[in-house]
Amino acid sequence: MKFTKKIRIPLARRALFGACALPLLFTAPAAAASPDALQAKAPAGSAAAAVKPETGTALGSLDVSQEATRYAVQAATTNGYSRLVPRASEKQPQAASAKRPLSRVMHAWPVRQEDGGATLLFSDSPEYATQNGILYRDTVQGDVRVLYYHVNQMSMPKKVAVVLENVGAGTSMVTISRSGTGRPSPHYLDVGKEAQASYFDAQKPRRFYLDKGEVRVLDDAMEQTTLAPGDLVYGTYDFHSTQKVRVSVIIYPAYMSAPTFLRFARVLPADDLHLRGTFPQADRTLRAERAYDPAHDGIVYVLLADNESDRYRTGIDATDGSRVLNYGNYGILYHLDLPVQGRNWTQFYLSPFGGTYAGAMRVQLPSGQQRLLLTPPDQTFFGVGSDSMTETAGIERARSAGLGLLTDTMELADIGCYHASSAPFFLFSPPGASNLPAAIIMMPAEK
């Protein structure tokens, strides 16, 4: 894949391919920071260096490795492709790193799974919209998550909006607790990463009231956002409604208002991949069965969205009643509870096993500190080439048995170095425009 090319692989097809070609033996050429450079994020030796001077709380290495990208900005490269890069004045010097052995054995770390939380309305079919209409629709109440991912495949500018109609018995109070969108663009990985960074960044709740029978867009910004031909739009909204609301995701002419268009709009047929539907309990908690001890447990991993250890969610397409499968668990919010113990520090990485990957996540510490993590932190995407690999029978058997190899060429995104006193809690969701599965890797920090 070249930076100047547009990524036009359907979202569902990317995830499905990643599940069929799931290499733990990763030997693709590295496109992101080298593993040696990432290994440099080791804890300082002194106790004073492990304390934040302004708060006195424990300082994990995420404060160093991710601070440089906290104020990420868009910068145009010479080939016209936009990449997330840190400001030069905020780049941190890289310490010398110890050489990692060529390969190491990894073991699957046992976790318990619990599903609960919001109802997901997932709109990704038709992914390439060739006519105006309703892309997805359902009626919900309570905690709701809406994810939409669509490309304007028409010759004229369009808008995409989420429209609410109060069909309940009285006035509804609608509270948006979290949201994230990417600016429409033909560069899909840029859109995907920006949407995730926005979703996982710190934000305050927003609230409005919807009278009985009233129709309005979920976010006024949708009415001001135009998609040029070929542009992708991608957004995720978490909200709560005290009354039943009919939710419609629509694509419509740029010169019209969403409520006006909705009066005569019809539901568009799904495409062949049929990746749309309503999925209850869209929050998934993966909780380790025991705390990880870097002094005794070696290198371990937790696989995400592989449809084996972490099964895809099933739902219903409310427009026709058909059963659907969420290939990739897009829109599922993962709560990763992976405590550590012992006196030594633990290094955490995210690694893309399915191919090209551009995303973000969030970490919460017992001290109350929270931080946005870009994956990868130093460029828009990584993992190029891993989706072209196939598994040998031996590797497939090893993976089924919970074994893998951490090789010298595996691409890793540093998501922090933690001590038992600062055990992390991660929020993760599969990013649109990226390939799956992905893995969280835990290993002893380099001394």
Where are these regions (language model features)?
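Exposed low-complexity, polar/acidic, P/S/T/G-rich flexible segments that act as propeptides
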Residues: 174, 242-287, 435-447
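Short, flexible helix-coil linker/hinge segments at the edges of structured domains or between repeats
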Residues: 181-210, 214, 256-267
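A eukaryote-biased signal for short, well-structured alpha-helical docking elements
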Residues: 85, 90-137, 272-313
